[in-house]
């Protein structure tokens, strides 16, 4: 069975087209296989059955979507429906619950079922909408200490006269209205957001310096999402771990031919911003997309005392390196915040299980993120408390402490 790659237009997925030939499959029967040279990969459609010998399956191969082998491993299981300690979700997109008292009550019930002590709403709520949401929360006897809101920065018009002054004024007004920080600054920042003159807005653009300085003066942490996973900037081929996700979502393709900045370019701009503003507290969403290279994030922590990281939507990496992740979380226990990103209540228990148990080889909740299994990293209680709530309370003024164990 032989295959060839078909050329793909920029931003599209390359397809593999079968040109099956019976002789190759037949050569594999009887145990001989098709020989390859040392260091050479097997041809597409075949697998290495012995050193330097490849064979094609006799049965038609399923697609990556349809291959769902049953887990036959018999090991202890510890399902964790509720967090061991009340958790602050620092990456909560629950703005849709803040329209009326009924929505807020619905959110409260779902938080109770998961032992979520507080939501930090990262929906860039500002101005009159912020005032309305704060008033709704403040009027609720059960939720007034369980929801806090981040404001946003409107990047439209960066570079035009008076933009920076207006942005700083908006931050000041929003702090007065009850905002406790800024964010989530979305992935378009640095990747696609344009200045007033049409040029690409860089993350470390000096036009933005007054805003970051104002955040430091106001005591507002900046919650920032930069770029995407590094694989999203790589060629879309069958060596890419995120092939399935990239084939499903065309807006996540940033690789060669798309005209987008490179992953390393974006990370360099981001890190330069953090260094330029050492008095400003920055929280990188998704652990900065460095969970596949924890040493890189550790170096950032060592060099940048103003930096904290939130762990939303990267559980697939944390849970596949349990020993390394355990050691990293223990070493940098003061620098990591719990966060989830999309509000899907049935997915939170996977986070509790990875963080709290030492379970082996269990399913992840979203196939297109990861085709591998997860392992628990078994964090000690004192570390869990910091990750779940203490670190968020320390870096963010205005987060209540009542109801959280000390």
Regions found by a protein language model. Give the residues of each.
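C-terminal segment of classical bacterial N-terminal signal peptides
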Residues: 15-23
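Acidic-and-aromatic substrate-binding clefts and catalytic sites of carbohydrate-active enzymes
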Residues: 95-103, 121-132, 156-165, 202, ...
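Active-site gating/metal-coordination segments in enzymes
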Residues: 69, 132-253
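Divalent metal-dependent hydrolysis catalytic cores, especially in the metallo-beta-lactamase
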Residues: 87-93, 106-128, 146-154, 180-187
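Histidine-centered divalent metal-coordination motifs
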Residues: 91-95, 225, 286
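H/E-rich (His + Asp/Glu) clusters that bind or coordinate divalent metals
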Residues: 254, 258-406
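Acidic (Asp/Glu)-rich catalytic clusters
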Residues: 79-82, 107-113, 132-147, 169-179, ...
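N-terminal pre-domain segments of enzymes
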Residues: 27-85
